[in-house]
């Protein structure tokens, strides 16, 4: 395959495909729909999925390196045991999709909709999560060390035991969250106090 001219798949519908263990390179899928496909243990390297839908797709134990899932929708799917390394997930939505255990190593997850997701124990350290929606998600014991959460939504999320040390929480509505057992640093403690109406003297 000529890597300088990767294949482009547009406006296609894939239903019931058995792609177990398939390897995807620098190819591009645009406005494609994947329905009830088995993509268990697939690997993607530099693959682009743009405005694609994954409905009832098994992505268990799949590995993705420097791939992009831009503005994709995952519904009733499974990422059990998947690994995403330096992937771009901007604007993607996850609905009734199994997300754990999940390994994330770097990447951009801004504007991602994870509303109501079970994200316990997942490591989001040093990720760009700007404007992402974690509303009503279970974030117990998840870690966000050094993550960028500017203007993210955490309303109604459970954060018991979560770690936010070094995270950027500017623009986040912090009042109303139960911070019991969550790990924070001095800067975040000040933001929480100010969100509750306290006047913090420097």
Residue positions per predicted region:
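Tandem repeat scaffolds
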Residues: 1-202
């Amino acid at each position: 395959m000529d890597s300088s001219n990767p294949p482009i798949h547009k406006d296609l519908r894939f239903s019931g495909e058995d792609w177990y263990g398939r390897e995807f390179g620098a190819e591009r899928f645009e406005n494609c729909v994947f329905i009830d496909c088995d993509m268990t243990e697939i690997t993607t390297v530099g693959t682009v999925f743009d405005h694609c839908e994954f409905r009832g797709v098994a992505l268990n134990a799949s590995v993705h390196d420097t791939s992009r899932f831009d503005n994709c929708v995952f519904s009733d799917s499974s990422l059990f045991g998947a690994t995403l390394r330096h992937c771009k997930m901007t604007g993607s939505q996850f609905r009734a999709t199994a997300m754990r255990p999940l390994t994330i190593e770097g990447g951009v997850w801004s504007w991602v909709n994870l509303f109501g997701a079970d994200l316990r124990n997942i490591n989001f350290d040093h990720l760009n999560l700007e404007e992402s929606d974690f509303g009503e998600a279970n974030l117990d014991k998840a870690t966000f060390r050094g993550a960028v959460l500017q203007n993210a939504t955490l309303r109604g999320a459970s954060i018991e035991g979560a770690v936010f040390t070094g995270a950027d929480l500017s623009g986040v509505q912090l009042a109303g969250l139960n911070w019991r057992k969550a790990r924070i640093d001095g800067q975040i403690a000040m933001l929480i106090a100010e969100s509750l109406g306290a006047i913090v003297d420097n």
